[in-house]
């Protein structure tokens, strides 16, 4: 089998395919960074043109390796792309100044990645490779998704707690088929740090290189259509903001969010919250996950929170939350503190928000109570006794 591959040769996704081709003894030739639009209208790379037209590193890799890939391999591809890679990029990109830096968000991704690596480390205690006794597409996919982390943020100190993952990673990247594509891989000697000047410079380069959208040419309207009153055209009805009719109040949520993101939580953000919170027009709620017995691995439990946040995106304008996973793998709980406008359950205001909330019990807290203030402060800082529960990791909705 021979074929053309479209994609940046230095991109880890393209490199996955090049390595898979070598493992399968297939000939794949790089044909440029961009895929031809007539054959790949979605514009996704890497893209493969050969005995089939395919896009995406995993699908192309599976196609090239053929029958050597089994269900066990596929599960690792899904783990790498669905769970591991988002945490890697969420931690690495801001650290190398390729994305804007928000301390708490980066800390979330760092904790999530560390949790996943601890699980993977236990899997690899007695294994040389992920599937079988030889290098496979599973190893290539997981290792390449971890490559940015090992290059930029997993320094010697971080690697001490994941000795099995590090040993396995070194084994994979030093295999001839992998080394031929990647060259010599150097591991991070220190954790990359965000640099505002570098971020500004990189952002300017990206903006400059972005293709400018062409303005559509205006076509002359037929006389009959031009004479038709504009009011006859159907107008798209805007959905009403569920919070629209509520009193505005004095608490400016965006100001608190900025303080929480950019200033010290204990000395700045928390005092700002309590000095400005408007208990007459806003409320504080605590939630507890109803089914802790169903929670297994920590990173999978965190994805429950991530999914909930994604589905509640439109609620962000009028809400803030700190959700925390407590405990360890197969022995954990989830609870959180939420703040939103109004004194009723916000989820009941819109059908779009009634997806996850029924999996939690909700308790309205007394904003004037010292006990409430203590608990809210703990959830904002991710520090405290938490009623005896052991903090694992937290996620912020803002």
Swiss-Prot record:
List the lineage, top down.
Eukaryota, Metazoa, Ecdysozoa, Nematoda, Chromadorea
Tell me which UniProt keywords the record has, alphabetically. Elongation factor, Protein biosynthesis
- Any idea what a deletion of this gene does? RNAi-mediated knockdown results in 100% sterility at 25 degrees Celsius.
UniProt domain GST C-terminal: residue ranges: 66-199
PANTHER family cross-referenced by the UniProt entry: ELONGATION FACTOR 1-GAMMA (PTHR43986:SF1)
PTM comment = AMPylated by fic-1.
Q: What is the name attached to this protein's record?
A: Probable elongation factor 1-gamma
Matching InterPro entries, A to Z? EF-GSTs, EF1B_G_C, EF1B_G_C_sf, Glutathione-S-Trfase_C-like, Glutathione-S-Trfase_C_sf, GST_C
From which domain of life does this come? Answer: Eukaryota
